[in-house]
Amino acid sequence: MRPPGSPELTPTPDAPHYQPGALRTPQAYVVQSGDALSAIAQKYNVNMQALAQVNKLTDPDALQVGQTLTIPLATPRPAVPGVKIIPDSELVYGPLAEKTDVQALIQSKAGYLANYSQVVNGDTLDAAQVVLLAARESSINPRLLLALLEYRSNWLTNPQPDPSLDEQPFGFSDAWYHGLYRQLEWAAIQLNTGYYGWRSKAVTNWILSDGSVVPIDPTINAGTAGVQNFFARLDDYSSWLKDVSPAGFYATYHKLFGDPFDLAIEPLVPADLVQPLMALPFGPGETWFFTGGPHLAWLDGTPYGAIDFAPPGDTQCGDESDAWVTAVADGVVTRTGNGEVILDLDGDGNEGSGWDILYMHIETRDRVQPGTVLHVGDHIGHPSCEGGDATGMHVHIARKFNGEWLSALGPLPFNLSGWVSAGTGEQYVGTLTRNGVILHNFDGASPDNQVQR
């Protein structure tokens, strides 16, 4: 953080990323097993809708192995200056995410949000509760979400905003992403996609809504990349240039919260970070099954930061398991609900600081309560199918540090009771290795994927 009264400084450039160019001649691509149209579009730096249109695909999800796709030429655009918009710590739900009282801010601005409510997961929530729920779930800074809402729809300060945006305040029209909560969820996906894509060097260009391909300035930071990608999904080229300029979204953020770089925490994730000791999430002597290799920590856009374990016995959804998911380390429970439990390992109660563990698919019955102090091996709850897509009862665990989702594939894999995670890069496919023994994940129970502490 910048000390009060000291001058504002220009953020330093990040180390440049390598940038390949856009296609110069049309190409053909033969669909392989496991391909998705979105991934093919990203690989060739073209707009997915344009790719579908050129190939007359009425259902983008119905690709056939061996099918030949024509890759259309993109509309190349010049790179834009490397203007940093926000630091990384202001994109994620980091150590200072709770600095702003969201409820008080919304009421003080007396805009549309001040009287807004929505039913989410069966509960009626006010606007502050909706924003905080979406922010914490996706690990996105609530200040960023509020500033984007204000920039796109004026919902924070205008009591009577444009009625055409009633159910889509970001201007993204989709039957699923309907209402404030789902719109925030959609925004989080775009922000995370840009942030972690830039972090992992998986993206080099933004594909705008008009099909333009804009090379990313190699010196921007991941937080800025997240914001640039958000606007890329909504804008044509001229609108995008304005939105990512100092006179665009940055000006709205600065007006609401001051210079975002005053709140920068750098580095957010130290290069020499070491995972603390963690145990497998079940009791000593028990045999569970490694059912899911590295896959999305949360929704689309997050890294492959989660792995799955299923208990012994019948694991059909709808049944109950009396097996116990346990604490992987000492900590305090900061949040529960809709299948989730968050365990804060530094014990300060701030989900955005230090190490935090997400447990997903924890049954409501016997689930641990917020504020409970736990020691390694203490009960969290029972594995189930609650809280999202699941083909059988299991527990999904993922890690965050200072609000950033950590990959289970990279230099900091899971180490649970000495079992170290690895993956192929294909979602859900991976291994656990300990003392030369290698377990391969399997969606079921087999001698080849059974694991013990």
Please annotate each region the language model reported.
Residues 13-49, 67-69, 73, 85-86, ...:
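Primarily a LysM-type cell-wall glycan-binding module
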Residues 31, 35-54, 66, 135, ...:
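Short alpha-helical segments in extracytoplasmic peptidoglycan/chitin-binding modules
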Residues 82-241:
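Catalytic glycan-binding domains that act on GlcNAc-containing polysaccharides
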Residues 173-291, 429-453:
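Non-catalytic cell-wall polysaccharide-engagement segments
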Residues 270-273, 277, 288-328:
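Short glycine/threonine/proline-enriched tight-turn/helix- or strand-capping micro-motif at secondary-structure
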Residues 276, 319, 369-375, 398-453:
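Acidic, glycine-rich catalytic/binding loops that coordinate metals and/or anionic ligands
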Residues 290, 331-333, 371-383:
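A structural signal for short beta-strand/turn segments enriched in small hydrophobics and glycine
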Residues 320-370, 392-394, 398:
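Zn2+-dependent peptidoglycan hydrolase active-site motif and core
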